Amino acid sequence: MKDNEVFIIGLGNPGKQYIKSRHNIGFLLLETFSKKYDAQFTLKNKLKSRYTEFKINDSIYKLFMPHTYMNNSGDAVKAIVDWYKISLDKVFIIVDDIDLPLGKIRFRKKGSSGGHNGLKDIINKLQTENFNRIKIGIGSPPINETKKQLNTISHVLGNISSQENSTLEKVYQKVIESLEELDIKNEDYIISELNSFHK
């Protein structure tokens, strides 16, 4: 790993049926980011991910979309970390969060999975909770205590509405702008900016 490399891993599920789902926000953000720099993703089997890279200022940004399905995200993240011999402070996980309102962002440098199966698997495979994660709120499903789990699954796997997408596009832009400034702004300042953002 070089000092000027930044590793961004967006979580989601591969497959056409999941492309526009709320659970695929990590993928959708990275696709938006890569298009800005005309970068194309290619499948890297050894990394269990689709991958692209581009340069911003003096930094090389490496973007990954795991091809393992959400619940096995840790397999891809561990493969990436081991292959590049990465210090985890250079890794940023992009993930959806059902406990955050739509349009809210939360940057955490460590912590539990919060019930998110993708984060849970990463913690299990890396054997640590100490890694950066940028959580993007997708809001909660309607309350129905008798079908709570079913409601949650259908909500995260459900497609993003056009109204939600309008909000999320602003969120993606804010996160991308913050990631672009990693080499010129203090990380604590970036964390504060993201955590105070709400569209």
From Swiss-Prot:
Gene Ontology cellular-component terms listed: cytoplasm
Gene3D superfamilies from the UniProt entry: Peptidyl-tRNA hydrolase
Reactions that this protein is recorded to catalyse: an N-acyl-L-alpha-aminoacyl-tRNA + H2O = an N-acyl-L-amino acid + a tRNA + H(+)
Keywords attached to this entry: Cytoplasm, Hydrolase, RNA-binding, tRNA-binding
One Pfam family cited in the UniProt record for this chain: Pept_tRNA_hydro
Annotated EC: 3.1.1.29
Feature type site, description Stabilizes the basic form of H active site to accept a proton: 96
Signal peptide limits: none
One term of GO molecular function: tRNA binding
One example of a Gene Ontology biological process annotation: protein quality control for misfolded or incompletely synthesized proteins
Residues annotated as the enzyme's active site: 23 (proton acceptor)
InterPro entries per record: Pept_tRNA_hydro (IPR001328), Pept_tRNA_hydro_CS (IPR018171), Pept_tRNA_hydro_sf (IPR036416)
Subcellular location: Cytoplasm
Lineage top rank: taxon: Bacteria
Function (record text): Hydrolyzes ribosome-free peptidyl-tRNAs (with 1 or more amino acids incorporated), which drop off the ribosome during protein synthesis, or as a result of ribosome stalling. Catalyzes the release of premature peptidyl moieties from peptidyl-tRNA molecules trapped in stalled 50S ribosomal subunits, and thus maintains levels of free tRNAs and 50S ribosomes.
Membership in a protein family: Belongs to the PTH family.
Annotated NCBIfam families: pth (TIGR00447)
Quaternary data: Monomer.
Descriptive protein name: Peptidyl-tRNA hydrolase
Species name: Prochlorococcus marinus (strain MIT 9515)
Lineage: Bacteria, Bacillati, Cyanobacteriota, Cyanophyceae, Synechococcales
